[in-house]
Amino acid sequence: MFDIKKYQGIFPAFYACYEDDGSVSPARTRALAKYLLDKGVKGLYVGGSSGECIYQGVEERKTILENVMAEVGGKMTIIAHVACNNTADSQELARHAESLGVDAIASIPPIYFHLPPYGIAQYWNDISAAAPNTDFIIYNIPQLAGVALSIPLLQEMKKNPRVIGVKNSSMPTQDIQMWKDEGGPDFVVMNGPDEQFISGLAMGATGGIGGTYAVMPELFQKVYNLYQAGEMKLAAEIQNEICRIIYKMCSARGNLYAVMKAILKKHGMDIGSVRKPLPALVDSDLAVVDEASAMIDAAIAKYC
């Protein structure tokens, strides 16, 4: 029987950490894991969209997870996203993740070809079978995967006893309510869209996994704690400021993750840039980095 408390709280989506030459950096990976552990977050979501997984090979993804686990394994909840464009590689990453002792694995549906629901279920169950002693979390992100989770598909997946929840990155918060209602009180549903974290909590989310959490974990933790304490007005005020920060970061020409990595560098955490084809920063983006960084610092000083 799994412990739902392991999945309650803030889970930064872990960023890809590269050397200056673009290769995966074990040292920087460990440094970022330690940095986030010290921030007091509940856990990490490793190898997902924010980790640039679709631009990495299987061995690179193994290296990243190995170094995260070596640094913080057993000290926080670790969810490893293991999906690849083919089942065999996904199963290899699932077996590897289980061998390292992660708390859960997760997977998006197969991308590019839009498979029927029974094909998606087979893909997920094949991955889960490769890690039979590890919790499995469905990752619903239809705007990028091209296919969406449905109640019938969730009902089919619930026949697998390892399936404990959904990471929901679809935009309607109603989806969170539907997955939670179908899954029951001990079913994990994680809010995905950072801009509506407080709304996701209100609809029943257990916690959140977010791509911007790592650059401002203090603010998301404050929103979560205030929500749990029933202080909704202040929680909403901070959520609105988080949204303004995200909008500012998204105003750059370079990719959002390049912006956030530059902000982390300003705070002493150099994890490199993004991997092509994600656009790197251009000179005009430096002002955006400075402004967003100042907004984060000011919000933390005001609210945390």
Feature locations, PLM:
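Catalytic alpha/beta core domains of metabolic enzymes, predominantly
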Residues: 130, 142-243, 253
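C-terminal alpha-helical cap/extension of soluble enzyme domains
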Residues: 6-17, 35, 39, 205, ...
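Alpha-helical structural signal in soluble globular domains
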Residues: 39, 63, 67-72, 96, ...
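Short secondary-structure capping/turn micro-motifs that flank functional sites
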Residues: 52-53, 113-114, 174, 198, ...
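A general structural signal for well-ordered alpha-helical segments in protein cores
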Residues: 29, 61, 65, 90, ...
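Active-site beta->alpha loop and helix N-cap motifs at the rims of alpha/beta catalytic domains
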Residues: 2-148
